[in-house]
Amino acid sequence: MNSPIRYFGGKNGMAKKILKYFPKEGSYNTYIEPFGGSFGVALHNPNIPPIEIYNDLDNNVYSLFKTLVDKEMFEEFQKLSDLIIYSEKVRKAFKQDLKEIPFNEDDKLSIVHRAFKFFYVNRTSRNGIGGFSINTCIRRNMSKSCSDMLSTIEGLPKLHDRLSKVIVTNQDGIKLINKYSQREDVFIYADPPYHQSTRTETRYNIDMNDEEQERFIDDCVNAKCKILISGYDCDAYKRLEENGFIKIKFVVHTMSGDHKTKKDKVECLWMNYKTELEDVDN
């Protein structure tokens, strides 16, 4: 099952590869994503543990997933989705609303409307964050852009069923790791913002500076729970390997933002538990 949103740094396309390195089924009963984002890896996992916790500090992303798990909120969200039109003008207005309207966690209707506007802006933007997306390819006798959005809307009921038992929170991801890291029945998949030393620009609404990355690494190194981390290789993360984490590298084929240039990137995984797979790069 694919994520309902496109997300910078999201792992939809790598999910099956990453899942190969998950701990054995039954070796944990609580699964946590402290930097939830698109939740792309978990949505591809056929082995669902008893407890799943999705967390994201971004109010827009949190609002969407909070709405998707709640029965009443989802029903209202679906009503809005059924009336949708694919419009650059609507996208511009919704984007402005997301900037100007204060986040109110105590107002369910407000969260639903924020969730819908974020969903709309995301699905009508190139790669979820660029300009208005117009794809001239034809699918189902319409623009591929419209077809993709309608397909996502049609899949929302199944997505709601899948997410209905997920616990959704809106807090600092590092604090969440710290809260659960000493429990041996917990497995944390951490996909934090790429370290700033590995990129030239900021595309995250909620980023992490070098000090926060150090705190994140501290908590991971001292954890008793199972942890799997994904990201780009960098000097700061060498401390993970120095403290017993296994590192795995694999090449990811991506397209540039304009969909014209192919790029190969090397993604890394770090884990503090043993894996049966042999392609381990120490």
Where are these regions (language model features)?
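Short beta-strand element of Class I
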Residues: P50-N55
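Long, positively charged, glycine-interspersed low-complexity recognition regions
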Residues: I206-N282
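S-adenosyl-L-methionine
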Residues: M1-F35, G40-V41, N47, K260
